[in-house]
Amino acid sequence: PYAYRAAYLGHLGEYHCPSCGTARPPLDVGAVEVRLAGMAGSTFVLAAGGQRVALTTVLPGLYNVYNVVAAAAAVLALGIPLPIVAAAVREFTPAFGRAESMTIAGHPAYMLLAKNPAGFNEVLRTALADGRPIVAVIAINDLTADGRDVSWLWDVDFEMLSDRCRLAVVTGIRAHDMAVRLKYAGLPQAAVVVEPDEGWALRRGVEALRAGEPLYVLPTYTAMLRLRHILARRGLVHTSWED
């Protein structure tokens, strides 16, 4: 197995093989001086071809710094000048459901799509970044676009919620599976509520919030579409095709 000097996200990091000497190749494009600001976004310096430019993105989380760097690497390879790349990053806004922000009953709310273990881990780290226990609505479906097999939930590090989640309202087709996963992650029984109806799940999450406290909505793909449909009917978000 690889040995890591630093592991940043999943299997990504500064690695080498102690046996054969294989190692991460030198970077053509990278991010340095990364500063994460929770749901407020991130700042970092994009380094490419001997040039460096300071960037701010509204996209939260280290995983989105990786996404920005990957997109920058692709367009730089096509010959787009770095200043144009930097301007595009600064003007970018997230797609619906991906770190989407809204206000529900006077509270800030954030929707963070999660589709696989590595992504869900980063979503959880981002939601927990300010150090306060959170209130979350976790919506899990198992339709074709989500993946029929939900055993991947056992590969997500939900244990990080064990003492940092004041309430988790689980909903969606596989709400009970999610509740079982949280039980074995160490969440107290009183901290997990099963509410199969997505609209009522949102309501129960909001009702549990204290003044100024945000709600984190963590859905799989089709659950995200269902939740946004409910929120759009209430006039809280645009319908997807209007974004």
Language-model features, listed with the residues they occupy:
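Membrane-targeting and insertion segments and their boundary/processing signals
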Residues: 41-45, 59, 94, 152
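Short glycine/threonine-rich catalytic loop with a Thr-x-Gly-x-Asp
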Residues: 59-70, 96-97
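ATP-dependent carboxylate-amine ligase
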Residues: 9-24, 73-82, 87-243
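General secondary-structure propensity
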Residues: 53-61, 191-193
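Glycine/charged-rich beta-loop-alpha catalytic/anionic-binding loops adjacent to active sites
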Residues: 48-57, 102-107
